[in-house]
A protein has these predicted regions:
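Interfacial segments of multi-pass membrane proteins
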Residues: 1-8, 129-144
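Juxtamembrane transmembrane-helix boundary motif
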Residues: 2-6, 25-117, 166-185
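Transmembrane helix-bundle signature of multi-pass membrane transporters/permeases
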Residues: 10-18, 49, 146-157
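Small-residue-rich packing faces within the transmembrane alpha-helices of Major Facilitator Superfamily
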Residues: 18-22, 77, 81-84, 154-158
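Helix-loop-helix "hairpin" substructures at the membrane interface of multi-pass membrane proteins
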Residues: 99-131, 137, 151-157
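C-terminal transmembrane helix-loop-helix hairpin of multi-pass membrane proteins
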Residues: 143, 151, 158, 162, ...
Length: 185
């Protein structure tokens, strides 16, 4: 296939994640096994989608501050390390932590925005971070948090892939490669 630009690789990866999350969410709905809390999950997902756009812009800005992309990558890695450390500390001590029961629409939008912003800035799906946030702010169990996390990621990926359709030259993409990644994802 040859070497592809990073923006093309990111687009292909985003399409793969989008297809995986869409499949998981739809499969759970059809099987009547979905525990997605639409009242909380939808504002979280909308906030995450908007936050994801902000996170991409923030990363572009941070990247423009340095002469080499590696320096921006180092900033990204440092922030990821801090968040991962916080996630680890929470996970180890979660039985000792008093969780919240956030239900306010604006709070859900803001929490979603922050999740989407971090996930996009860091270039990650957000899974483990989403789970910790859903456990803490919404006192969700493991299955409910996992399904709501996939729902949030689904919205974020729709926005991200949609943005890429308008901002990335996709002429290098082999349709066979795209279909293969989506089907095998």
């Amino acid at each position: 296939f040859g070497a592809l630009d990073v923006s093309i690789i990111n687009f292909l990866s985003g399409c793969t994640v989008l297809s995986m999350t869409m499949y998981s969410v739809i499969k759970a709905k059809i099987a009547k096994d979905s525990v997605i809390n639409m009242k909380l999950g939808t504002p979280l997902a909308i906030g995450a989608a908007i936050g994801g756009l902000f996170g991409k812009e923030l990363f572009s800005y941070v990247e423009s501050l340095f002469d080499t992309p590696n320096t921006a990558g180092a900033v990204q890695a440092f922030v990821l390390m801090l968040i991962t450390l916080g996630t680890l500390i929470y996970t180890i001590n979660k039985n000792k932590v008093h969780t919240l029961h956030v239900t306010n629409l604006l709070a859900c939008l803001i929490i979603g925005f922050i999740l989407g912003g971090f996930s996009s800035f860091l270039g990650i799906g957000g899974g483990p971070i989403n789970l910790v946030v859903l456990y803490f702010f919404f006192t969700m169990g493991t299955k409910e948090a996992a399904q709501n996390s996939l729902y949030i990621i689904l919205f974020s990926q729709i926005t991200s892939v949609g943005r890429s359709l308008f901002t990335t030259d996709l002429s290098q993409i082999s349709i066979v490669l795209l279909i293969g990644m989506i089907a095998c994802g």
